[in-house]
């Protein structure tokens, strides 16, 4: 917890300008439908940074931190399968919940969030899945609300920066390595995955959180949890 407190305090005390400079200088890791990610270090400790685009609608005072479906999207768009999604504030809400569970000793199976900040950001293009706006609108039902959401993302001038505990592997990568190693490693890994997924899912559901994007490339592991 001392390391968490140190990193959290360091980030919280940076001005928007200084924090933006740190994020801009971070090592890029990738980008996709959920935003862009990078790796920075605070006193030698790796910190995973995720930037999720915020629309002008998200930034209206009455909508800040709202998890509502502001654009009136079809409900199937909330699944993380390449759709326009419901908004960045939902992601913040989830990380706030899971971090507090870890800090409160209720469940240790989530990466902790050190800090979050809204930062100016106009350098991101639409992700590949939405880049062809006409095609994406048609694929997701053709409704005007879908078009408004995608075009709002396209015109985004800010992002939600989430500063998270760095977990080195996706479950997909790690499990593939274990299965290819030998039978004993594969059995041990499969047992760990089954137990952790069952425990984590049961805990989240009991606390009122339902995860719609729990595929193996969106689950992280350090080989122990």
Residue positions per predicted region:
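Protein kinase catalytic-loop region centered on the HRD/HxD motif
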Residues: 201-209
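Structural motif in protein kinase domains
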Residues: 167-178
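C-lobe/activation-segment region of protein kinase-like
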Residues: 184-187, 206, 224-225
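Conserved ATP-binding subdomain of kinase catalytic cores across diverse folds
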Residues: 15, 20-162
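Activation segment of protein kinase catalytic domains, centered on the conserved DFG
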Residues: 179-192
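Catalytic activation segment of kinase domains across protein kinase-like and atypical kinase folds
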Residues: 126-127, 134, 210-225
